[in-house]
Amino acid sequence: MNAAAEAEFNILLATDSYKVTHYKQYPPNTSKVYSYFECREKKTENSKVRKVKYEETVFYGLQYILNKYLKGKVVTKEKIQEAKEVYREHFQDDVFNERGWNYILEKYDGHLPIEVKAVPEGSVIPRGNVLFTVENTDPECYWLTNWIETILVQSWYPITVATNSREQKKILAKYLLETSGNLDGLEYKLHDFGYRGVSSQETAGIGASAHLVNFKGTDTVAGIALIKKYYGTKDPVPGYSVPAAEHSTITAWGKDHEKDAFEHIVTQFSSVPVSVVSDSYDIYNACEKIWGEDLRHLIVSRSTEAPLIIRPDSGNPLDTVLKVLDILGKKFPVTENSKGYKLLPPYLRVIQGDGVDINTLQEIVEGMKQKKWSIENVSFGSGGALLQKLTRDLLNCSFKCSYVVTNGLGVNVFKDPVADPNKRSKKGRLSLHRTPAGNFVTLEEGKGDLEEYGHDLLHTVFKNGKVTKSYSFDEVRKNAQLNIEQDVAPH
């Protein structure tokens, strides 16, 4: 985004319409509104509905929002004027809080008198715990806390992508360990194919970065710049890719020249891994005849560092992977690893990048295990399912007011709708703690002030227009590691 486009962002216009009218709705003499964000627990979910439980979430992406949209001088005379005009037309009435915004402009030079406290980025926290809190630091600006709910709750997206990606990593880790005895290459087992499947460039950057919290393979280039700009890494880049064919680079040779296309591409990329989509006409013929016979001599001469990666891209994902492995297993020398599972030679691998979501992934690796194929043989690509087939409802991401000060008196507030106990919200000032047993617990009603519970895991990350604490992407990744990764030392 260039500087001109960035300057156009107006926080006064980045809220739900109804919030423009809320400053008139709070009790008179309200001086503080304190709200919090959580991924609510579903206590009454029908267990048959959803295969994956999502019992814990990866907290990621707030740092990006704070830095891109909320820090610094975000209120100007021009932006107030612009908002005033838009809302006059939008509501057909003068409901806009011009006085309140002018106060922020004059008293704070357009910096937001808000404090945000949050759990460290990359933290893995069970559902139903507080993840961040927001409160006004100036009693005149009680209305500002929930004005910024809209933009802050958009953190649901990176949180959900990172969480779903990590749940898939758990599946891959479990089956890789069971079928090979180690976790080598785990971080390259799920590759991001989602750039074209998301709704915008910004979505691509945010979503790709969230997947890279857990993995290192991506074709969504937008994630790299976002991480470098808003998080930073010790490595030159946080994500990697390899040369790969698409259908056009095969079909452009004509139907009778698929072998020539394959030969040309593997020769062009002889010393690095290369992925070749092989289902333009007949995936099984391609594996058996072209790769297994006609071009076999070119494949067996490749090094371990530069395998051919055959990519099927149609049909039932499980059936296709098993049949491809079966054909390749008859055409190339297969060995048995220490766990008793079949392994293709190191110069040959398979990537399944079609129809992969968290449910089909589980089915494919389970099916492979049953047929005694090691997960070492394959990797996966996921696009729309990884970055777009997600909503705020998946983890029940919610922002609610829990504490207000009116007439100088603090009051613990909550909602508890009669028709849905899942929507009950927490009360009072909140803090997050670890019990001696290592479990997370959210304390309500300011009870975290008592020393017996240990220190609060929520840290101030934003105060009065300044980002006060930041996390590097390396820290985020370390926080989000699987327990199994810490237990199994890499070879």
Swiss-Prot record:
The modification Phosphotyrosine is found at Y188. It comes from the Eukaryota. The modification Phosphoserine is found at S472. Keywords: Acetylation, Biological rhythms, Cytokine, Cytoplasm, Glycosyltransferase, Nucleus, Phosphoprotein, Pyridine nucleotide biosynthesis, Secreted, Transferase. GO terms for biological process: circadian regulation of gene expression; circadian rhythm; inflammatory response; NAD biosynthetic process; NAD biosynthetic process via the salvage pathway; NADP biosynthetic process; nicotinamide metabolic process; positive regulation of canonical NF-kappaB signal transduction. Induction: Expression shows a diurnal pattern of oscillation across the 24-hour light-dark cycle in liver, with a reduction in levels before the onset of the dark period (at protein level). Expression shows a diurnal pattern of oscillation in white adipose tissue (WAT), peaking at the beginning of the dark period. Up-regulated during polyclonal immune responses. Pathway: Cofactor biosynthesis; NAD(+) biosynthesis; nicotinamide D-ribonucleotide from 5-phospho-alpha-D-ribose 1-diphosphate and nicotinamide: step 1/1. One of its GO terms (molecular function) is identical protein binding. It is found in: Nucleus; Cytoplasm; Secreted. It holds the Pfam family NAPRTase. The modification N-acetylmethionine is found at M1. Beta-nicotinamide D-ribonucleotide binds at D219, R311, P312, D313, G353, D354, G384, R392. Ubiquitously expressed in lymphoid and non-lymphoid tissues. It catalyses: beta-nicotinamide D-ribonucleotide + diphosphate = 5-phospho-alpha-D-ribose 1-diphosphate + nicotinamide + H(+). Gene3D superfamilies: Aldolase class I. The keyword Nucleus applies. Diphosphate binds at R196, H247, R311. It is an enzyme of class 2 (transferase). Homodimer. PANTHER family: NICOTINAMIDE PHOSPHORIBOSYLTRANSFERASE. NCBIfam families: PRK09198.1. The secreted form behaves both as a cytokine with immunomodulating properties and an adipokine with anti-diabetic properties, it has no enzymatic activity, partly because of lack of activation by ATP, which has a low level in extracellular space and plasma. Catalyzes the condensation of nicotinamide with 5-phosphoribosyl-1-pyrophosphate to yield nicotinamide mononucleotide, an intermediate in the biosynthesis of NAD. It is the rate limiting component in the mammalian NAD biosynthesis pathway. Plays a role in the modulation of circadian clock function. Belongs to the NAPRTase family. This is Nicotinamide phosphoribosyltransferase. It comes from Mus musculus. The lineage of its organism: Eukaryota, Metazoa, Chordata, Craniata, Vertebrata.
